[in-house]
Amino acid sequence: MPELPEVEVVRRGLERHIVGASIDSVDILHPRAIRRHLPGAADLAGQLTGERIASADRRGKYLWLVLEPSTVALVVHLGMSGQMLVQPPELPTEKHLRIRARLDSGLDLRFVDQRTFGGWALAPLVDVDGSLVPDSVAHIARDPLDPRFDLAATVKVVRGKHTEVKRALLDQTVVSGIGNIYADEALWRARIHGNRLTDRLSGPKVREVLTAAQEVMREALTQGGTSFDALYVNVNGESGYFDRSLSAYGQEDRPCPRCGTAIRREKFMNRSSFSCPKCQPAPRRSLAKSSV
């Protein structure tokens, strides 16, 4: 699933190419693409037609288009393989095209989704701590690249939990936008094993992890995000290349860039974690062991 840098790359592309345009028509080509919009396809198409796209916004991994003159946003769920492509209408239809919106600018906004886990849905905007967000996103915490992200407050929240530090990083109600890739990269930079317990880490250590997450995601942004296959692309269909700069994630058995020790892969929350056993020694007591 795309993480903050990948979603931000898409947001910036949408901001550049479609903000200010109005929607002339909408074609729903697959029912699963609008399953989160409970009133159905005709309602979604009807509400979008004639609306002007005022802005492209994001919080963490969540992306939405603010519409005018209403107080409604089009929430875009990218899922595992969703793509928001801006294309000239004469280009051939993509094999997995699910929704097509024709804009008055002469361009198409196309939602392509091979695995059909993503989709579009309308949601009312609500005020949360001085920011307007879709009500479906209201429970999501600010992300590390948000100008109003409160690092000190987030450190306090993390340390107030009794859980593994990686699990806390992945909790979108604590800090949003960080997924498996950037959690592993941030922990590697901070030299902390993901199974370390949050209430046993010092404030400076938690701050170091969160700062590392900020740094690695900013670097990923400059390289268009991380693409491991053709499913993640920007609005022009181009892949990112930060995967070439990863130090831990996906690097099993390769030498740690810092000390040369082979990177190790471990199971964590039905996924894999990657770390250096020398730079990031595992804790003697994990959460599972301490609860026995």
Swiss-Prot record:
Molecular functions (GO terms): 8-oxo-7,8-dihydroguanine DNA N-glycosylase activity; class I DNA-(apurinic or apyrimidinic site) endonuclease activity; damaged DNA binding; zinc ion binding
GO terms for biological process, alphabetical: base-excision repair
Keyword Hydrolase: yes
Signal peptide: none
Cofactor: Zn(2+)
Cofactor stoichiometry and binding remark: Binds 1 zinc ion per subunit.
Alphabetical UniProt keywords: DNA damage, DNA repair, DNA-binding, Glycosidase, Hydrolase, Lyase, Metal-binding, Multifunctional enzyme, Zinc, Zinc-finger
Entries under Gene3D superfamilies matching the protein: 1.10.8.50, MutM-like, N-terminal
Job description of the protein: Involved in base excision repair of DNA damaged by oxidation or by mutagenic agents. Acts as a DNA glycosylase that recognizes and removes damaged bases. Has a preference for oxidized purines, such as 7,8-dihydro-8-oxoguanine (8-oxoG). Has AP (apurinic/apyrimidinic) lyase activity and introduces nicks in the DNA strand. Cleaves the DNA backbone by beta-delta elimination to generate a single-strand break at the site of the removed base with both 3'- and 5'-phosphates.
Membership in a protein family: Belongs to the FPG family.
Name of the protein in question: Formamidopyrimidine-DNA glycosylase
Source organism per UniProt: Rhodococcus jostii (strain RHA1)
